[in-house]
Amino acid sequence: MIRTLLLSTLVAGALSCGVSTYAPDMSRMLGGEEARPNSWPWQVSLQYSSNGQWYHTCGGSLIANSWVLTAAHCISSSGIYRVMLGQHNLYVAESGSLAVSVSKIVVHKDWNSDQVSKGNDIALLKLANPVSLTDKIQLACLPPAGTILPNNYPCYVTGWGRLQTNGALPDDLKQGQLLVVDYATCSSSGWWGSTVKTNMICAGGDGVICTCNGDSGGPLNCQASDGRWEVHGIGSLTSVLGCNYYYKPSIFTRVSNYNDWINSVIANN
């Protein structure tokens, strides 16, 4: 019990979490632009190995020194993975960046890749070695359990995903503002309908900014009243109609629905 409580404090409410040495450039947020280098220091690139090379596949968030939060659909049972931390341009050797192998993967037991709309698209990656925090590598905060963000709450998506449907993958980390769409709206006909569940968050839907292929698993960053950034969402779904489609906001796994699961996995592994 003591161990579980301690982990809950360290992971979900760490005193040093959610603060960046290099503050995000908020003036760049509205149009989906290149992020200020290392301004989202919990953002990681999840990469898989193929023929001796490493390739970006998804994003993720560092939530403890040995643990990364990502989406279950990013994981293949046969894959070999590593994460890149403290990186801005994925194709340039950068001072302060770090590559760490993934030693264990825990996918939520209720995730079903054949029934994606049921949700539970969440996984935890244990790193082979705990990482030291630096000005370029920091922990994300998790939101308090059960938190539901109000309609139009401004959050910010970050990642190395495609800039548009079938578009190119960027070299540099991108960022963009997404407004939360409440469940009542997002689950209505003409929006996502019954695809959306209460264990998800919708954000965007303006036809301009959204997540796209390669952003999956990455954070939906929302600022708390104390100024710290909390990861409220994990990139999960976009519309088959395209990445930037009206009334089809990006869908994220709602992290505040899984605090107990996250703490339990870390405590027992």
Swiss-Prot record:
Entry's localization field: Secreted
Catalytic reactions of this protein: Preferential cleavage: Leu-|-Xaa, Met-|-Xaa and Phe-|-Xaa. Hydrolyzes elastin
TM region(s), chain numbering: none
Record domain Peptidase S1: where: 29-267
Main location: secreted
Active-site residues, as the UniProt record annotates them: H73, D121, S216
Protein known as: Chymotrypsin-like elastase family member 2B
Organism: Homo sapiens (Human)
This protein's UniProt keywords: Disulfide bond, Hydrolase, Protease, Secreted, Serine protease, Signal, Zymogen
Function: Acts upon elastin.
Main EC class the enzyme belongs to: hydrolase
Gene3D superfamilies in alphabetical order: Trypsin-like serine proteases
Propeptide segments, given as residue ranges: 17-28
Origin: domain of life: Eukaryota
GO biological process terms on file: proteolysis
GO molecular function terms listed in the Swiss-Prot or TrEMBL record: serine-type endopeptidase activity
First and last residue of the signal peptide: 1-16
InterPro entries membership: Peptidase_S1_Elastase_sf (IPR050850), Peptidase_S1_PA (IPR009003), Peptidase_S1_PA_chymotrypsin (IPR043504), Peptidase_S1A (IPR001314), Trypsin_dom (IPR001254), TRYPSIN_HIS (IPR018114), TRYPSIN_SER (IPR033116)
EC number annotated for this UniProt entry: 3.4.21.71
One of the record's GO cellular component terms: extracellular space
Protein family: Belongs to the peptidase S1 family. Elastase subfamily.
Tissue expression from the record: Pancreas.
Disulfide cysteine pairs (residue numbers): C58-C74, C155-C222, C186-C202, C212-C243
